[in-house]
């Protein structure tokens, strides 16, 4: 529902980052802030607490991050606090990462296997996906024992499911239909 809004915030910050030649720095800093918020119960409690006013929340964030992140990022965080959107910072980060990939002709491919891919398999997969999508492929690999065997690939909205677990489910469905 708020994806459009998340994208607008992300695009605004991305444009500022581009103007200042600090895209990588901004992405890195935002990831760090997201991790700090996610891993700190105290910060989450402060942000969610209805009796702590917006001004106080902004003061706390300024104290926490003024020497750790660029001033433009701090201003961005303060705007999110003002608009009561700071708890959704991770969504803005994800959108900013998507924008980065788009602008650099890259695409993320999520891969699930039971065991890690060999170097040759990884290179072949990157090459084939690169040819198919005509973009540089960024692999995000995950080990998932539940797939039993094979490989699961997700690129954007496209899914290539060559897992043994899916094939077994399909066979089971076919057998049940025949009965």
Swiss-Prot record:
InterPro entries: ATP_synth_OSCP/delta_N_sf, ATPase_OSCP/d_CS, ATPase_OSCP/dsu. PROSITE patterns: ATPASE_DELTA (PS00389). It is a peripheral membrane protein. One of its GO terms (molecular function) is proton-transporting ATP synthase activity, rotational mechanism. Keywords: ATP synthesis, Cell membrane, CF(1), Hydrogen ion transport, Ion transport, Membrane, Transport. One of its GO terms (cellular component) is proton-transporting ATP synthase complex. Pfam families: OSCP. It is found in: Cell membrane. F(1)F(0) ATP synthase produces ATP from ADP in the presence of a proton or sodium gradient. F-type ATPases consist of two structural domains, F(1) containing the extramembraneous catalytic core and F(0) containing the membrane proton channel, linked together by a central stalk and a peripheral stalk. During catalysis, ATP synthesis in the catalytic domain of F(1) is coupled via a rotary mechanism of the central stalk subunits to proton translocation. Belongs to the ATPase delta chain family. F-type ATPases have 2 components, F(1) - the catalytic core - and F(0) - the membrane proton channel. F(1) has five subunits: alpha(3), beta(3), gamma(1), delta(1), epsilon(1). F(0) has three main subunits: a(1), b(2) and c(10-14). The alpha and beta chains form an alternating ring which encloses part of the gamma chain. F(1) is attached to F(0) by a central stalk formed by the gamma and epsilon chains, while a peripheral stalk is formed by the delta and b chains. PANTHER family: ATP SYNTHASE DELTA CHAIN. This is ATP synthase subunit delta. It comes from Clostridium botulinum (strain Kyoto / Type A2).
């Amino acid at each position: 529902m708020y994806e459009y809004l998340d994208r607008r915030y992300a695009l605004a910050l991305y444009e500022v980052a581009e103007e200042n030649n600090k895209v990588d720095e901004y992405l890195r800093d935002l990831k760090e802030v997201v991790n700090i918020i996610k891993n700190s119960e105290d910060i989450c409690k402060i942000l969610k607490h209805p009796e702590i006013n917006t001004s106080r929340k902004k003061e706390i964030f300024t104290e926490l991050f003024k020497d750790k992140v660029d001033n433009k990022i701090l201003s961005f965080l303060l705007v999110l606090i003002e608009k009561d959107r700071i708890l959704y910072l991770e969504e803005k980060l994800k959108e900013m990462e998507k924008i980065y990939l788009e602008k650099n002709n890259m695409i993320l491919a999520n891969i699930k296997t039971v065991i890690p891919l060999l170097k040759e398999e990884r290179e072949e997969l990157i090459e084939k996906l690169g040819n198919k999508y005509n973009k540089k492929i960024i692999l995000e690999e995950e080990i998932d024992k539940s797939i039993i065997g094979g490989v699961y690939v997700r690129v954007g909205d496209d899914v290539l499911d060559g897992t043994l677990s899916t094939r077994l489910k399909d066979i089971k469905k076919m057998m049940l239909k025949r009965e």
